[in-house]
Amino acid sequence: QGRILLKKPDAFLKELGDCYLMERDYEQMMPLFVRTLELNPGSIDNITVQLSFARSNDIVNSIDPVIEKTLKSLCQKTDYLPVFDELAVWYNLQIRNYLLALQHAVLLNNKSENKLHIFLNIALDAINNKAFDQATIAYQKILGKGKENNPFYLPARKGILTCRYEQLRQSPADRSDYLQIAGDCEKYMQEFGYTPTNIDILSLLAELYAYRLQRPDSADRLLDKAIRMPRLNSNTLSQLKSQRADLLTFMDNPWEATILYTQLEKANPNNDIGYEAKLKKAMLAYYAGDLLWAKAQFDVLKGATSKLISNDAIQMSHFIHMNYEAEGDNRDLEKMGRTEYLLYKQQFQEVLPRLDSLIGHCSPGISDYATLQKARSLCACFQDEEAAKLLSELKDRSEQVYIKAEALFQLAGLKRKQKELQQAKELYRLLVTDYSGSVYSIEAAKLYRDLEAGEQTEVNNL
């Protein structure tokens, strides 16, 4: 009625689109959003926010076919607007179709200037979802434009190094592969300097030295040099100190590590950096057999703002509480702590026999927990089939709810990695329905929805 009275057919596009969105009438909504973009391409962020909201509330998955049909119709036209390539990139990132996202990003950059950041967005999203080959292509598109007048050149140079490292970590790799990445990181630092803007590559190089190339002393010197660098912001300095404390723990120097963690706690009393330092310091106490002090720290951290930190604290507090003997012998519990320290230091050949001993001779509480740690060790050694078998047996036999829940969650993660998605989905469903009180139920629900959305996307693409 307002349009008729004003004699303006394009009036109230947003308002009408929002109304149809709330009514879930997506067939009526999309043409209004398309017209909005035609009149004002700068509203793309606004439109994608609305579409994200619609997708998150679309329980029957009726909006994706409408979006796909609309994009197909628009992009078949000869001279369609660049903003629709931008919309196509956004949508294909939602459904993780990185190749199609890259195609539209290329088209967009052929039509418009200053759109290289789109490739950066694709690369970061692809890395998060382990689509490393597509991430590499996206970075190469940026690097292909050269250094001159290219503000995304350095982020792409850094990103491609990180991408290569993360890709190697997914499966057994030769030392020579890690040496090559370390060499490229060293060349980058020589070319662009040991400055605060390049701390991320320095940090990556330290990780390569420490955990992949058996050169922890080189890593320690590098991190010490970084910490002394002038003009570091407080957050970066804290992250470097945390990385160095982790390294000192790995190098069997828990006392120096504890000093650094304590400094981090005091410098960050009410944020996740401080909470994480407190958690790691509590783990050091647990490794050393100071069980009651460690439990007291875990109890404090149950209310941490970070879900990951609070979940770890809850798990460790519960494990110690259930297995500590106030008037009895805690040698098995202390042995478990020492064994976990060896696991932290990646001494797998020594860890596995110790875990087998704990599994075979300890009470069910410690035996089941040791089985979880053995599964983690096997995964770290890329023995996924053996780990999956162990976890499957544990979830069936254990009488401890929190152990069963963790076994289910670990097993579901392995099934996802092995592309056995139906089994993973069923395991996540079990966590949500049968273990709703566990620390994993919320994350399991999210992962279940992701798998379901992925299935529907495959159906739509057929």
PLM feature segments, named:
Residues 1-462:
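Acidic, polar-rich low-complexity tracts and alpha-helical solenoid repeat scaffolds
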